[in-house]
Every structure is written in C-alpha cells, then in structure tokens.
Design a protein with these regions (language model features):
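RecB-family 4Fe-4S metal-dependent nuclease core
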Residues: 1-246
Length: 246
C-alpha cells in the first residue's frame, strides 16, 4: 500500500496529478506489489502468510483507500500540488548510537514547502480501523517519527525547528454511520518541539544502554522480566518458543 501511494504522490508532485491519474493504474500497481510481497513472504507459496480470501480482502480494502485518496478534495487535505516539493521517498537513516550500534530506518515521504522552506516528514500507517486516542498518545509510536526528525536534521545539516512531522493513517475498515461520513484516511500530528524530541531521545538512549554495553555487545548482567499482555502473540520470542507469554 505504501509503495503505491509513494509512487502516485511522486508522479503528482514531480509531474502533475492529472497526468498521474491518467497514466498510472494505481490498483494494478497495488495488486502487483501485493502479489510480489505474498510470493516472497510465503516462500513461493510453500508457506502462505494468509488465505486467498484474506488476500483478496486486503486488496479490496486497498482499492477503497486509493479511491478515497485520489479524489482531489481528499488529496488536498494532505498534500499541496502548488506548495509541496518532493524531497525524498524511503529516505535511509543510519546513525551511529554506540560502537557497533546504529539506528537504522527509512522515512516514508519527505516534502519541502516552496513558500516557507519548512520540511515535512510523513509516515504512512495502515490500520484496521484507525488509531484510538490511546494509540495516538503512545510514546513508542510517536518516538519513532520524532527520532526520524532528529536524525534527518543531523543528516542534512539543518535545524530540527524547520521540520514538521505527521502520521497519515490509512483505515482498512470504516464504520457506516448514517449522519456523517467517516474519513478513510486521517492525520495525526504529534507534538514535536524540542522537549518532545529530548524526551524521545532520552527514552531511546536508556533503552539502548539497558541492552548494549559500551562496545555494542549485548549485556548479560541484566535480567529482563517478561510483561505478559495481549501483544504477546506478536512477539518474536513467543513465536520462537523462548517465552510462554504467561
């Protein structure tokens, strides 16, 4: 889904939206990307990651997201054809934290305002029904994009004060409400001033120091008590049988 939006947006901002709509079959592009992903992750179909029915459902949900986004009135709520200048897609970040320990990631989308010169980092997030207020206030979710802001500013040598950040949340499922239309795509803009960045950096640094020593080796002098929760099913240690999740 993200690759499809990135390619479509690239064409919109580099050429024109009318040409992107005319020359790019976004649904066919999405279908092909999902097919490639399914084959790769399923070991050429030997170990399917989902059923055929589920794959079709995911694809149809993606079509609805694309239909919504490509309508000009919706598109204009997120991007400006006149003001947004495309800077980067999948911008790599590889910053040294400690010896043999680097922060690595890819920023989905970066634009710069032609009027003000401000940068905007966009992170696309696909969600079943959108983010709740608890998810929007989750420090771990927000810290990711705040660290992107810090490290990208350092990478290109600019002040983080001229970088804005946002999550664009793509909802696979939208409840039907008679009185009003619930948007299929929404935006979450977390606080990203200096105090927020410092707090995110402090939390991340403490995590790194609790896991690695000064040489970048895993610490063996620390015990990490398990914290059972409904998220245990997603944990690698649970899947590998290293933890019972209880």
């Amino acid at each position: 889904m993200h690759e499809t939006l990135q390619e479509y947006l690239s064409r919109c901002l580099r050429i024109s939206k009318s040409q992107a709509d005319k020359n790019m079959d976004t649904k066919e592009f999405l279908k092909e990307k999902m097919r490639e992903f399914f084959i790769k992750e399923s070991n050429d179909g030997a170990n399917p990651i989902c059923s055929k029915e589920e794959l079709v459902e995911f694809l149809e949900d993606g079509y609805l997201i694309l239909d919504y986004f490509q309508k000009s009135k919706n598109f204009n709520n997120f991007f400006s054809l006149k003001d947004d200048e495309l800077v980067a897609i999948e911008q790599p970040i590889n910053t040294k934290i400690l010896e043999n320990v680097n922060f690595m990631g890819f920023i989905d989308f970066i634009v710069r305002s032609k009027k003000t010169g401000r940068y905007r980092i966009t992170d696309f997030k696909t969600s079943t029904k959108g983010w709740s207020k608890y998810q929007k206030s989750d420090p771990i979710k927000n810290s990711q994009i705040l660290l992107y802001k810090k490290f990208y500013a350092e990478l290109i040598g600019i002040s983080p004060d001229i970088i804005d950040v946002e999550f664009i949340i793509l909802k696979r499922k939208v409840a039907e409400v008679e009185d009003f239309t619930i948007p299929r795509i929404s935006k979450h803009v977390p606080a990203s001033g200096k105090p927020s960045i410092n707090k995110a950096w402090k939390g991340f640094s403490e995590f790194v120091e609790s896991v690695f020593d000064s040489e970048g080796k895993y610490r063996t002098d620390v015990e990490y008590p398990k914290k059972p929760s409904k998220l245990c099913g997603w944990c690698e240690f649970f899947e590998r049988g290293l933890c019972d999740g209880k």
